[in-house]
Amino acid sequence: MSKKTSLTPEEMRREALNTALSTIERKYGSGSVMKLSDDAHTNVAVIPSGSIGLDLALGVGGIPRGRVTEIYGPESSGKTTLALHMIAECQKQGGTAAFIDAEHALDINYARRLGVKTDEMLISQPDYGEQALDIADMLVRSNAVDVVVIDSVAALIPQSELEGNMGETQVGSQARLMSHAMRKLTGTIHKSRTSVIFINQIRMKIGTMGYGSPETTTGGNALKFYCSVRIDVRKIQTLKDKEEVYGNRVRVKIVKNKVAPPFREAQFDILYGQGVSRTGELIDLGVETGIVEKSGAWYAFGSERLGQGKENVRQMLQENTTLREAIEQKLLEHLGMREPVQSADEAEKQD
């Protein structure tokens, strides 16, 4: 007679788990449940933000794909400018971008100046909130769009509110709309690898006293919970040349980050009509890392004297692309954001 093999409790647990996993896969498809070691996509895929400092603060080199990002702040702080830079970076990588303009305020000429290929960008100007979010849902489900920007949450007015009288109150209607939309969108976004960016405004809480910030974002709490990244954008300084204002100094803070450590900050210049000054970032980060030397008001890169005053150096580097690219290459190598360029001799030695 053959002896019946007895299983240890641990083996019985494994067999029960394997049976459950095979049942789940038959019912819901392959990949419904997996070990992290089985997943080939554990590294976070990103879309660069267009700002070296912001990419560094985000910890992964950009905004994550397959997740929701919220950019919020006061008016004219640079929220839409940042989102347009992200669209431009996505298009540089050969991706497809969509802009849902709920505010009906997108400046196409400004977008072009930031590097956005407006002829290739999908744009929608919906009439009400449900339409905007349905369009976003369908674009995400198509698996053919890399980034979707919704500008802004405050402009996503529920249809019931639009059809009501002007003085009629609709308590919590926008929060309910956003809560339902986020429950529906989040799973689809993750599967599609689309990066969805919500631009939001801030409001003052009524009757807030004592502890806590008096500011809050529109659209309820659902967006805060479902976001993987929340970026707070603030204008901290007005840039002037004598009496002429030519831009703003902006501080961004990563107040929530599920893909890297949060609460990192970055500062950079946003110039009117030009967007984020990448050249200005090269100067600031170059001085911070020691790649660009600063003595008084004079700047130097190695033996090359760049000029006196940041604005003069910025203009000089914009004209001298070879020198600007050399500084950028060295800075990105130092920050670990780009592989070092090998010389011909080093390449021959490796071969």
Swiss-Prot record:
GO cellular component, as recorded: cytosol
Keyword Lyase: no
Alphabetized Pfam families for the sequence: RecA, RecA_C
Subcellular location: Cytoplasm
Family annotation (InterPro entries): AAA+_ATPase, DNA_recomb/repair_RecA, P-loop_NTPase, RecA-like_C, RecA-like_N, RecA_ATP-bd, RecA_C_sf, RecA_monomer-monomer_interface
Binding site for ATP: 73-80
Record's keyword annotation contains DNA damage: yes
Domain of life assignment: Bacteria
Example of a GO biological process term: DNA recombination
Gene3D superfamilies reported in the protein's UniProt record: P-loop containing nucleotide triphosphate hydrolases
An MF annotation (GO) of this entry: ATP binding
Keywords of this entry: ATP-binding, Cytoplasm, DNA damage, DNA recombination, DNA repair, DNA-binding, Nucleotide-binding, SOS response
Protein's job: Can catalyze the hydrolysis of ATP in the presence of single-stranded DNA, the ATP-dependent uptake of single-stranded DNA by duplex DNA, and the ATP-dependent hybridization of homologous single-stranded DNAs. It interacts with LexA causing its activation and leading to its autocatalytic cleavage.
Entry similarity comment: Belongs to the RecA family.
Designated name of the protein: Protein RecA
Organism: Oleidesulfovibrio alaskensis (strain ATCC BAA-1058 / DSM 17464 / G20)
Gene name tied to this protein: recA
